[in-house]
UniProtKB/Swiss-Prot annotation:
Gene3D superfamilies in the record: High mobility group box domain
Span list, region Disordered: 29-48, 87-140
Listed name of the protein: Transcription factor SOX-3
Keyword Transcription regulation found: yes
Highest taxon listed in the record's lineage: Eukaryota
Disease implication from the record: Panhypopituitarism X-linked: Affected individuals have absent infundibulum, anterior pituitary hypoplasia, and ectopic posterior pituitary.
Cellular localization per UniProt: Nucleus
Assigned keywords, A-Z: Developmental protein, Disease variant, DNA-binding, Intellectual disability, Nucleus, Transcription, Transcription regulation
Lineage of the organism: Eukaryota, Metazoa, Chordata, Craniata, Vertebrata
Taxonomic source organism: Homo sapiens
Gly residues: compositionally biased ranges: 96-107, 117-134
UniProt record, GO biological process: brain development; central nervous system development; face development; hypothalamus development; negative regulation of neuron differentiation; negative regulation of transcription by RNA polymerase II; neuron differentiation; pituitary gland development
Length: 446
């Protein structure tokens, strides 16, 4: 011990307790060079009780070599043992070496140590309020009758089927428990009641706080499940297809309401007149001899100039049909039936083939016996199909419009400049087709 006393008796002896206390208070490792520049005048202000609050930092010099003349042998060995076992923890054996601050620090550290030792076996008696709260969170609920019964059955089934998953075992145990009678369940129910009574005695302040986070997420996902099933790329197409299907299958939809106005003049005149207005070829409805129509590739088979609004159609119907005809003109299918026009308006934004298929389905479903009034066809069909379509269209038009015109015959209708004169352009347009449709009545009109 002689060299140690010589080393610690000079200028270094009053400097060591301050360095050690500073490292204890801050609980951070300090490099050795910062310890060397510590002024020696701060030694008398430090108290020895600070040595028991926290362990010296790992980077600090070894205390037994510098505190041999200050601490007794048992305290020095206990300090060294604590440093080896828990470098950053709290020494619990040096309670008798400090001043008034030592008992409090030692008591807290011993309580924490006791709480850590007893954390697996329930609440500890020497733990503080915080320790008791953490132990209370670890308290499990008392087992019910099924858990009491399934505890032994699960072990047996796991031994019999080592490769079976725990979830499958739980399913089988639940099914077996439901098959048991009340007499067979009675002992397990009594055992569960006894366990609950014991649990209430041990933890009188226990309150069950369930964690419902996962279940709430499942509830939220349940409402958003239909939209989540669709791939992200097909969302818009599926929405448009659903709208088209709803418009086609609805009993009182846009197509059916448009069909009520079909009997007035036999044609959805709004489509043609609106296309003319959009293209800058608008003309007043009272003109009896219109100029020749412009050449339009999608509708080159129909005379748009000869088909105007009927004076018998109410203004509300005209404005209503304008909306549907606008969507039909935008999608490129102006020569289809009113219900097909409505379906095309619902299917706006899809591919042309998809819109044509939806329009054809809507026309077939909503027109009923009037299904062949105007056929939905591509813009350039074969000549045979075109002539057949023209014969059907002209025959149906003449037959339906003659119901609402004053009596006078076809010649008077063709020659008069009044409402019947709008058929003049239609006659001129379809004369080249060589179709004799006078006096023909289609079967679909009956």
């Amino acid at each position: 011990m002689r060299p140690v006393r010589e080393n610690s008796s000079g200028a270094r002896s009053p400097r060591v307790p301050a360095d050690l206390a500073r490292s204890i208070l801050i609980s951070l490792p300090f490099p050795p060079d910062s310890l060397a520049h510590r002024p020696p005048s701060s030694a008398p202000t430090e108290s020895q009780g600070l040595f028991t609050v926290a362990a010296p930092a790992p980077g600090a010099p070894s205390p037994p070599a510098t505190l041999a003349h200050l601490l007794p042998a048992p305290a020095m060995y206990s300090l060294l043992e604590t440093e080896l076992k828990n470098p950053v923890g709290t020494p619990t054996q040096a309670a008798g070496t400090g001043g008034p601050a030592a008992p409090g620090g030692a008591g807290k550290s011993s309580a924490n140590a006791a709480g850590g030792a007893n954390s697996g076996g329930g609440s500890s008696g020497g733990a503080s309020g915080g320790g008791g709260g953490t132990d209370q969170d670890r308290v499990k609920r008392p087992m019910n009758a099924f858990m009491v019964w399934s505890r032994g059955q699960r072990r047996k089934m796991a031994l019999e089927n080592p490769k079976m998953h725990n979830s499958e075992i739980s399913k089988r145990l639940g099914a077996d428990w439901k098959l048991l009678t009340d007499a067979e369940k009675r002992p397990f129910i009594d055992e569960a009641k006894r366990l609950r009574a014991v649990h209430m005695k041990e933890y009188p302040d226990y309150k069950y706080r369930p964690r419902r986070k996962t279940k709430t997420l499942l509830k939220k996902d349940k409402y958003s499940l239909p939209s989540g099933l669709l791939p992200p790329g097909a969302a818009a197409a599926a929405a448009a297809a659903a709208a088209a299907a709803a418009a086609a299958s609805s009993p009182v939809g846009v197509g059916q309401r448009l069909d009520t106005y079909t009997h007035v003049n036999g044609w959805a005149n709004g489509a043609y007149s609106l296309v003319q207005e959009q293209l800058g070829y608008a003309q007043p409805p009272s003109m009896s001899s219109p100029p020749p129509p412009p050449a339009l590739p999608p509708m080159h088979r129909y005379d748009m100039a000869g088909l105007q609004y009927s004076p018998m159609m109410p203004p509300g119907a005209q404005s209503y049909m304008n909306v549907a005809a606008a969507a039909a003109a935008a999608s490129g299918y102006g020569g289809m039936a009113p219900s097909a026009t409505a379906a095309a308006a619902a299917a706006y934004g899809q591919q042309p083939a998809t819109a044509a298929a939806a329009a054809a389905a809507a026309a077939a479903m909503s027109l009923g016996p009037m299904g062949s009034v105007v056929k939905s066809e591509p813009s350039s069909p074969p000549p045979a199909i075109a002539s057949h379509s023209q014969r059907a269209c002209l025959g149906d038009l003449r037959d339906m419009i003659s119901m609402y015109l004053p009596p006078g015959g076809d010649a008077a209708d063709a020659a008069s400049p009044l409402p019947g004169g709008r058929l003049h352009g239609v006659h001129q347009h379809y004369q080249g087709a060589g179709t004799a449709v006078n006096g023909t009545v289609p079967l679909t009109h009956i």
